[in-house]
UniProtKB/Swiss-Prot annotation:
This is Actin. Disulfide bonds: none annotated. One of its GO terms (molecular function) is hydrolase activity. It is found in: Cytoplasm, Cytoskeleton. It comes from Mesostigma viride (Green alga). SUPFAM superfamilies: Actin-like ATPase domain (SSF53067). SMART domains: ACTIN. The lineage of its organism: Eukaryota, Viridiplantae, Streptophyta, Mesostigmatophyceae, Mesostigmatales. One of its GO terms (cellular component) is cytoplasm. Belongs to the actin family. Actins are highly conserved proteins that are involved in various types of cell motility and are ubiquitously expressed in all eukaryotic cells.
Amino acid sequence: MADEGEVSALMCDNGSGMVKAGFAGDDAPRAVFPSIVGRPRHQGVMVGMGQKDAYVGDEAQSKRGILTLKYPIEHGIVTNWDDMEKIWHHTFYNELRVAPEEHPVLLTEAPLNPKANREKMTQIMFETFNVPAMYVAIQAVLSLYASGRTTGIVLDSGDGVTHTVPIYEGYALPHAILRLDLAGRDLTDYLMKILTERGYSFTTTAEREIVRDIKEKLAYVAIDYEAELATANTSSSIEKSYELPDGQVITIGNERFRCPEVLFNPGYVGMESAGIHETTYNSIMRCDVDIRKDLYGNIVLSGGSTMXPGIADRMSKEITALAPSSMKIKVVAPPERKYSVWIGGSILASLSTFQAMWIAKSEYDESGPSIVHRKCF
């Protein structure tokens, strides 16, 4: 942690599914909550409750029966700024319990985030929250830093979007970044669908949360999909039981690996796009021939949707099949990859060399929101 008397920076990673926030220098985020804002469906039905016009995060989640829930971040990009402001307000005042005007704030953005979005983010931080300094970093770059590298290709797959981001000497290569609109939320939807085919009914948003839990606890990636299906059909070795909140116990078999298989075969959910292995390969092929070897040897997985057991081995197998035969392939799956964007930000914001990189309020007052393009790249 920072020295006494020194003001610690705040690190906030805004994902499509979860917000991860905390203090730079810490080894894990203090606050992790859903990126949702809920508004009452009916005015004044809740007797004796101080009616709030909006609920954020876990509180919105727990009162979801009487609220309309919205995700202000879609596919990694902020689409609803009023709700986003509510999320940041909740992060600073309720979760971290700090005054934002007293701390520099490091925020994250999706790769290829539109310029206007970074400016809006900058403007809200300085004008609404009066922060003394701020910086915007690309999520995948922070994940790479967290793995102790400055060159490599990051496959970052969260709840709302997946990106492959080649990075050389600390700089993302924008022409080679690829985006795949297939991520955790789609895997949950697919698992709901295949469990329904098995005769279990999951339809509501509340039930979706149960299925998400089943996915997180039981899903895994098969090294050989066809062989695994054959095994599943002939034996019950992969079957696991799961207890629903009402006490009913359900059995889940081949769904365990059919669910994350979608990442390698998006066709299963009707998407005509390449799987994560092919997208990673395509991304590498868009880079200069001289740096490809460094990328093949440093494929770093990041984000919650890369947490399924077996994913690194399968990824390694698939990319080895695509790459030149003499190429050395290394897929790295750090155990803390669910939070590696946050951890990378925590590391970056506490480096002494980074202190000159912050955008100060004085610079913002002089240049306006466009300062972000000159100082954050």
